[in-house]
Amino acid sequence: MALLSIRNVFKSYFLHGKRIDILRGVSLDIQRGELVSLVGASGAGKSTFLHVLGTLDAPAAGEVMFEDRSVFSMNDAEIAEFRNQTIGFVFQSHFLLPEFTALENVAMPALIRRQDRTAAYAYARELLERVGLGHRVDHRPGELSGGEAQRVALARALVLKPAVLLADEPTGNLDPATGEGIHQLLREVNREQGITAVVVTHNETLARSMPRRLRLAGGEVSEA
């Protein structure tokens, strides 16, 4: 059984009175533990696809399945709980809380879920060290570069050990060496935790490093 299944998904927007079809009958299976990259031209709908996959945006038609559960047949509270328990997100904007340190930002999802405080902070610190920010744990977002803030956001997305990681350009603001460190971290958490990751990227090196590569063009997803 696939971990994630997308069946005949459509999504459209209206811009200046004109309908724009972003997803046109997309069907796809993603297996547990797969590392998947998604490439495509700017404006092709990669972020929209990620949002539908992550239940942040409902499709106009079609179905998203997690194992044997039809996600969008749940009510709003059930969808929110499913998302919080199952999916870690890394967005193009880091959305860190400015009044909290890097360590506090990373630990916060675990604390909200009432995990042990000492364990939550210890794992948050470990993740920050693994993204190369062990020396920046006490700095607030305003004291970090864009690339550093994005790495904090990645650590935060991993702190609950989600089954699925959805990342939108996680290396977009990083230099090549730091970007390679992020690639390595994704491979490590995949090996250690069996995490399934779908990564939207323009970085050809990152895309090629993933065992499975997809391309979104013309509203359709194909193997790249």
From Swiss-Prot:
Domain ABC transporter positions: 4-224
Membrane topology: Peripheral membrane protein
One GO MF term: ATP binding
Gene Ontology biological-process annotations: lipoprotein localization to outer membrane; protein localization to outer membrane
Record-linked Gene3D superfamilies: P-loop containing nucleotide triphosphate hydrolases (3.40.50.300)
Organism placement in taxonomy: Bacteria, Pseudomonadati, Myxococcota, Myxococcia, Myxococcales
One Pfam entry name: ABC_tran
Name this protein carries in UniProt: Lipoprotein-releasing system ATP-binding protein LolD
Origin superkingdom: Bacteria
Top class in the EC scheme: translocase
Swiss-Prot/TrEMBL keywords: ATP-binding, Cell inner membrane, Cell membrane, Membrane, Nucleotide-binding, Translocase, Transport
Key word Acyltransferase present: no
GO cellular component, one term: plasma membrane
Function statement: Part of the ABC transporter complex LolCDE involved in the translocation of mature outer membrane-directed lipoproteins, from the inner membrane to the periplasmic chaperone, LolA. Responsible for the formation of the LolA-lipoprotein complex in an ATP-dependent manner.
Cleaved signal peptide residues: none
Subunit structure: The complex is composed of two ATP-binding proteins (LolD) and two transmembrane proteins (LolC and LolE).
Binding site residues for ATP: 40-47
Originating species: Myxococcus xanthus (strain DK1622)
The family this protein is said to belong to: Belongs to the ABC transporter superfamily. Lipoprotein translocase (TC 3.A.1.125) family.
E.C. designation(s): 7.6.2.-
Coiled coil residues, start to end: none
SUPFAM superfamilies cross-referenced by the UniProt entry: P-loop containing nucleoside triphosphate hydrolases (SSF52540)
